[in-house]
A protein has these predicted regions:
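Alpha-helical membrane-inserting segments
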Residues: 42, 62, 66, 70, ...
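Interfacial segments of alpha-helical transmembrane regions
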Residues: 41-66
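Hydrophobic alpha-helical transmembrane segments of polytopic
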Residues: 27-30, 56, 60, 124-127
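N-terminal transmembrane-helix/juxtamembrane module of multi-pass inner/ER membrane proteins
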Residues: 1-38, 51, 67-95
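Structural signal for the C-terminal ends of transmembrane alpha-helices
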Residues: 18, 43-50, 116, 162
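Alpha-helical transmembrane segments of integral membrane proteins
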Residues: 37, 51-59, 120-123, 144-148
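Transmembrane helix-loop junctions in multipass membrane proteins, especially transporters and channels
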Residues: 47-50, 75-80, 139-144, 161
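Membrane-embedded catalytic cores of phosphoryl/pyrophosphoryl-handling enzymes
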Residues: 84-162
């Protein structure tokens, strides 16, 4: 992604204040989806699928901690740091761009849902991809950050499904 690419991709959003507001709302709503779906998964697994509960309680947090350490070690700059752009989404600080923790977390949560309710699981993985697009358009992630975050989230989630 170049500054020119970013300008071209975001021009329609910049020209329409409601579209920019929708981007902000989508970022917030899709992020909150993960905060809602993981605890709900744990409650429902407690009630109906105890083996899934223990896998989700172990694999997801361990994967998240390992993932966070990987991000901190790589400490890649964000697009607004490396390019001369005005990001549509505000974020304090810099670095730790690669891979996207939002894409990773939501795709991992979606994969955890598959054994309990596949439609919710797949819808959540799709929501993770959509959140990735929102964060790229927001100027706070590179496309590769999102792609790797999704791939690693799905891969770690497979450990819950197996």
């Amino acid at each position: 992604m170049t500054a020119g690419d970013y300008a071209r991709w975001t021009a329609p959003l910049r020209a329409r204040p409601r579209a920019r507001a929708a981007l902000f709302c989508a970022n917030r709503a899709l992020t909150l989806l993960g905060y809602t779906l993981y605890p709900l998964l744990l409650v429902l697994a407690w009630l109906w699928a105890r083996p899934l509960l223990w896998r989700a309680l172990v694999v997801a947090p361990v994967a998240f901690v390992a993932f966070s350490h990987l991000r901190a070690r790589i400490d890649a700059p964000r697009p607004y740091e490396a390019l001369d752009i005005d990001p549509l989404l505000a974020r304090k600080g810099g670095g730790v761009s690669f891979p996207s923790r939002h894409a990773f977390s939501l795709s991992l949560i979606g994969m955890c849902w598959l054994p309990l309710c596949a439609p919710v699981g797949w819808a959540t993985v799709v929501a993770a991809a959509l959140l990735g697009v929102v964060r790229v358009l927001g100027g706070i992630h590179w496309p590769r950050d999102v792609a790797w975050g999704l791939a690693l989230g799905v891969a770690c989630g497979l450990l819950v499904c197996l």
